[in-house]
Amino acid sequence: MKLSHLDEKNHPKMVDVSDKNITSRIATASGMIYMSQEAFDVIKNNTAKKGPVLQTAIIAAIMGAKKTSEIIPMCHPLMLSKVETDIMEFVKECAFKLIVTVKCEGKTGVEMEALSGVSIGLLTIYDMIKAIDKSMRITDILLESKEGGKSGKFVRS
C-alpha cells in the first residue's frame, strides 16, 4: 500500500485535497484517566488548588481539537463547526472517561481533531492533579466512530 504522505522520492508531503468534495464530517474519540482515590476525590469535590479540573479539561479538549493542525504535521487546518465533550465518572475505578465529538463541512476528516481533543483534555487533568498523584494512567485513547468522506462510516464494535 502506497502511503499518501510520501512523494515519489519518499519525502514527506501534505496530501492535496483540492479535488475532493466538501462533505459533512464527524468523528468521536474517547480516552480514560485512572488515579488514586485522593486525586479522584479532589476532582469530584472541586477542591484542586489549580481550579476546576473537569471544566478546565473540557476547555483544553476544545482548544486541542482546534489546534490539531499546528501540532500534527500532516493535518490540514480545518474550520470546525462543532466540538462537543462529555466526561463520565467511574467511581469504583477512580477514573474519568473523556469523550470528544468534532464536526465540520470539509474535504478531509476530523478524526485527528477528536483524538487530539481527548489527548489534550486528559493531559490537562494530569497536569492539574499531578501534585497529588504522579502515578495517574492515561489509557485507551481511541476513535469511537467517524462518518463522511470516501471511506464512509466507521463504528468501533
Swiss-Prot record:
Which reaction does this chain catalyze?
(8S)-3',8-cyclo-7,8-dihydroguanosine 5'-triphosphate = cyclic pyranopterin phosphate + diphosphate
GO biological process, any: Mo-molybdopterin cofactor biosynthetic process
- Any one GO molecular-function label of the UniProt entry: cyclic pyranopterin monophosphate synthase activity
Which positions in this protein are listed as binding substrate?
M74, C75, H76, M112, E113
The keyword Lyase belongs to this UniProt entry's keyword annotation:
yes
Q: In which pathway does it act?
A: Cofactor biosynthesis; molybdopterin biosynthesis
Keywords attached to this Swiss-Prot or TrEMBL record, sorted alphabetically, are: Lyase, Molybdenum cofactor biosynthesis
Q: Which domain of life is it from?
A: Bacteria
Subunit details for this protein?
Homohexamer; trimer of dimers.
Q: Which HAMAP family match?
A: MoaC_B (MF_01224_B)
Similarity comment: Belongs to the MoaC family.
Provide the function of this protein. Answer: Catalyzes the conversion of (8S)-3',8-cyclo-7,8-dihydroguanosine 5'-triphosphate to cyclic pyranopterin monophosphate (cPMP).
PANTHER family (UniProt xref)? MOLYBDOPTERIN COFACTOR SYNTHESIS PROTEIN A
Q: What is this protein called?
A: Cyclic pyranopterin monophosphate synthase
Organism field: Campylobacter jejuni subsp. jejuni serotype O:6 (strain 81116 / NCTC 11828)
Question: Gene for this protein?
Answer: moaC
